């Protein structure tokens, strides 16, 4: 009896040891998981990363609550918010809340704060790293000039995100470096004045326009950012900046940072 007990105990110890020893495989990162280091070691992956930013300009959420798609695209959010049409989502639709005055600081489907800043971070990281991607000799011939264009396309996309923030919120934090996600205090950035945001957007678009072609010649580049797109967005940004909403609007005279910085210009320019 004692002998059988010892044999069972020994077998259990062996089994436990084999199970614990086999857990090492869990420490290996799955090959299909893409990391930032992998992306910026391969020009093809880096180009795909840029493509994903083009995709992210549109907030691909539920169509009934997607602000950019409904505000600027083929769907008309304002049509459903008025009496022109009825949202098929019924009483749960954001447009219904809009009609009834139900939008609050806690529920605002038109707000893109997190989405925009996520893309700002992604574009900034791309701008900082794309020129460091190693290229083979054959890739140098293909991508030598394109890398500079990739960088400026990302610069445009970042400027567009700030334009979108400007037209929604006016003065916003201007973040031009990739923040450390572990540094909570460093993430607490105050808002910058409207004029500073406008100047930044225009400066970024000028730089991008100086590198990108006037237009793209072949259909494979259809939809890519061009010099014309940069100048068009700059013109629209300046139009917003010159509007009574932002230019000398005294309704915003008390909108200041804690240090007293005036966030909206109070004199008409």
Kindly give the residue locations of the regions a language model identified.
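Bacterial Sec-dependent N-terminal signal peptides
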Residues: 1-31
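Amphipathic alpha-helical protein-interaction segments enriched in hydrophobic
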Residues: 223-233
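Short coil/turn linking the two alpha-helices of tandem helical-hairpin repeats
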Residues: 166-167, 173, 216, 240-249
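A solvent-exposed, charged loop/short amphipathic helix patch at secondary-structure junctions
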Residues: 249-268
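Membrane-proximal, proline-rich intrinsically disordered regions
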Residues: 23-76, 256
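Conserved, well-structured interaction surfaces
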Residues: 42, 47-63, 87-169, 185-199, ...
């Amino acid at each position: 009896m004692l002998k059988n007990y010892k044999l069972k105990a020994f077998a259990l110890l062996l089994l436990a040891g084999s199970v614990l020893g086999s857990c090492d495989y869990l420490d290996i990162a799955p090959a299909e998981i893409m990391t930032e280091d992998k992306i910026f070691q391969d020009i093809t992956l880096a180009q795909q990363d840029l493509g994903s930013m083009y995709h992210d300009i549109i907030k691909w959420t539920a169509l009934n609550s997607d602000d950019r798609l409904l505000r600027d695209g083929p769907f008309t959010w304002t049509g459903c918010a008025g009496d022109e049409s009825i949202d098929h989502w019924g009483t749960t639709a954001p447009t219904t809340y809009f009609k009834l005055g139900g939008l609050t600081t806690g529920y605002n489907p038109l707000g893109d704060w997190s989405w925009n800043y996520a893309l700002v971070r992604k574009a900034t990281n791309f701008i900082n790293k794309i020129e460091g991607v190693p290229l083979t000799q054959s890739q140098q011939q293909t991508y030598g000039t394109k890398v500079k264009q990739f960088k400026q396309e990302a610069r445009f996309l970042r400027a567009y995100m700030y334009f979108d923030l400007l037209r929604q919120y006016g003065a916003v934090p201007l973040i031009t470096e990739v923040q450390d996600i572990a540094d909570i205090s460093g993430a607490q950035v105050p808002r910058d004045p409207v004029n500073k945001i406008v100047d930044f957007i225009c400066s970024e678009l000028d730089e991008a326009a100086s590198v990108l072609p006037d237009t793209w010649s072949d259909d494979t580049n259809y939809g890519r950012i061009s010099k014309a797109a940069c100048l068009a967005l700059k013109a629209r940004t300046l139009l917003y900046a010159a509007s009574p909403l932002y230019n000398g609007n005294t309704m915003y005279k008390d909108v200041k940072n804690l240090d007293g910085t005036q966030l909206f210009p109070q004199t008409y320019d």
